[in-house]
Amino acid sequence: MSYENILVEPEGAVAIVTVNRPKVMNALNAKTLSELAHAFDALEADANVRCIVITGAGDKAFIAGADINELKAMQSAMDAKRLAYFGQQVFARLDRASKPSIAMINGFALGGGCELALACTLRTASKTAKIGLPEVSLGIIPGYGGTQRLARIAGPGVAREWVLTGDLFTAEEAHRVGVVNRLFAPEELREGTLKIVHTILSRGPVAVRLAIEAIRRGINMSQQEGEIIESDMFGLASTTADMREGMAAFLEKRKADFQGR
């Protein structure tokens, strides 16, 4: 399917999703969010796709937040609540997906753009990128899951600083507090990100899926409850042909040929 505001480009087992509104720094309006929701659903259902990379068009912005004109048009608290819930549900598709997603942050990742990145499994960034949640400077707060995901990823102290000041942070600062996983020079961002992707793709597909599930579910549980989930996922992995192939390949000192079953 073709879209108006996003591009979806398959590269083997990888799908690269680009928010394509460079004239407005790839701002997220309702149509763009709807297109992302459709694309995320389609990619989750596509057995040929094993990893999703998300980025923004151009070299200035990843996604510079929500569309201000749409925010201004809100007439009531219920309008705002509906908008926030809609964005939360779009981003939750990434958070709950069985496939890993990587936000490839090539420029400003602000507000809703930062929140979209936080919903991804991993985040890579250009060393020149700026990241933040500046909503309080507009008299509102993050509404697409930012207050919750940032606290879980980087801790409540970092979340309070980012949300309450509304400051923008360098990619280096975001990396230091754990928001960004890997930093690259701008000209090396795509290659470096895809190298991470292909490392993940070389691992056991079932094991990757089960590991994502164990981490996602365990975050909201006690240590003891999380370890029960972990042992469940470990048990499932141990019954797969991939596990037998991985063990055999290790003992035979060869590269494993995983089949995803």
Segments the model singles out, each with a brief description of its role:
Residues 1-3, 248-261:
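Terminal low-complexity tails and localization/encapsulation signals of metabolic enzymes
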Residues 1-55, 92:
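Conserved CoA-thioester-binding segment of acyl-CoA-metabolizing enzymes
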Residues 32-35, 83-86, 189, 230:
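Hydrophobic alpha-helical membrane-association signature
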Residues 56-93, 109, 221-222:
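Glycine- (often His-adjacent) and acidic-residue-rich active-site loop
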Residues 17, 21, 36, 54, ...:
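Terminal peptide-recognition signature
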Residues 92-208, 235-240, 244-248, 254:
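Crotonase-fold acyl-CoA enzyme core
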